[in-house]
Regions:
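Short alpha-helix
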Residues: 119-142
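Short, glycine-/aromatic-enriched active-site segment of Class I SAM-dependent methyltransferases
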Residues: 98-119, 132
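Conserved catalytic loop of SAM-dependent methyltransferase domains
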Residues: 138-167
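A short glycine-rich, Lys/Arg-flanked "PGG" loop and its adjoining helix->strand segment in the class I
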Residues: 76-91
Length: 193
């Protein structure tokens, strides 16, 4: 869901924030929160995926893709779709899982990754920067990288189901339960030409 990004951008003083999410559950959650806020806020969520957005829209100052890239069967197509949403000079903020390695390295799990069945590609940072340049982005750069910790992502009284600790090798938290490198998240910025 894109809830937190929509609200944080409103608090940063943006004039209009539009999120997209193909999951009805997250759209309804957003609408409930907006309704209880009790005032008209310049933020909305459309119940669609990026593939349903108009092609070559070139309308947005900033586009966020947070935790989406590794769920896409074609990361190159996703990067192109993101670029085509941005106005000239607009900024992409992309957060995704990465693996260590030189340019050209990408983990393509044959089965699950951290118990997730829908993880297709985990590039190295240099590989993702190369993909961004190939898709026409200017000045792509990584601005943060960190290994996800079990203190950050954990079960709580409010979230009682499985969490990161259940997805990691119990004897070696540097690996997933399947033996892959543990989740490392990186944030990238780039501009549309």
């Amino acid at each position: 869901g894109c809830l937190e990004w929509n609200w944080s951008n409103i608090f940063l003083g943006k004039k209009r924030v539009i999120g997209i999410d193909p999951s009805p559950k997250f759209v309804f959650q957003f609408q409930a929160i907006k309704n209880f806020a009790g005032k008209e806020l310049p933020v909305d969520v459309l119940p669609i995926g990026i593939e349903d957005m108009p092609k070559k829209l070139e309308a947005f100052d900033t586009v966020f893709s947070m935790g989406i890239l590794y769920h896409r069967r074609s990361p190159m197509d996703h990067l192109r779709e993101l670029r085509e949403l941005l106005r000239p000079g607009g900024q992409l903020v992309l957060e995704t899982l990465v693996v260590e390695g030189p340019e050209g390295t990408a983990l393509v799990p044959e089965g699950r990754y951290a118990k997730m069945p829908n993880v297709w590609y985990l590039p190295s940072p240099d590989t993702l920067l190369s993909w961004m340049r190939k898709n026409g982005f200017k000045n792509p750069r990584m601005v943060d990288i960190s290994t996800t910790s079990i203190e950050e992502q954990r079960s709580t009284d409010w979230m009682t189901f499985e969490s990161l600790e259940d997805f990691l090798d119990p004897n070696d938290h540097s690996k997933t339960i399947e033996g892959h490198p543990a989740p490392t998240r990186a944030v990238f910025l780039a501009e549309a030409p």
